[in-house]
Amino acid sequence: MMKKSKRSDVDPFIVMDVMESARIAEEKGKDIIHMEVGQPGTPAPKIAKDYITNEINKNNLGYTVSLGLPALRTKISKLYGDWYNLDLNPNRIVVTTGSSGAFILSFSALFDSGDRVGIGSPSYPSYRQILKSLSLETVDIQTKLQNRFQPVPEDITDNNLNGILVASPANPTGSMLD
């Protein structure tokens, strides 16, 4: 039998089980209101769908450069400048296929095996799973309603942390930093 890595011993991501149960119920004709995941509530804009269709039709599909298409990274940089008045160099932007891939890249770049990383509680369950799979120690930081469920300096003074994950907006609370 193949040996199983200790890093793979993560808690199940229960929301996936909930989604599967909902899918089965929908197949049986049940009307389900999905509140289990942060799926977009609207379709992709027509201009985006048209652009993607055009690109697929005119170009061969294949791998992009590893950090993401330079034109897309430049547009993301411009968006940050327009929206937040932030001068962000496109070379500092990495485009991923989803947040989990971005978490893995970020945590791998920032922490070494065995480092202690604080996460606010409640928090997105995947943070804990990803940190554990990277052999990082997760330290729960109990957050409070009066702080909008965000960690504050007083919450982290005695935890001997190598880093802290601050999410804004936070999942599952939806709270945001000012």
Enumerate the language-model features and the residues they cover.
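Conserved PLP-anchoring active-site segment centered on the Schiff-base-forming lysine
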Residues: A109-L131
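A short helix-loop-beta submotif of the ANL/AMP-binding
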Residues: K132-T138
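N-terminal small-domain helix-loop-helix segment of the aminotransferase-like
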Residues: K4, S8-G98, L105
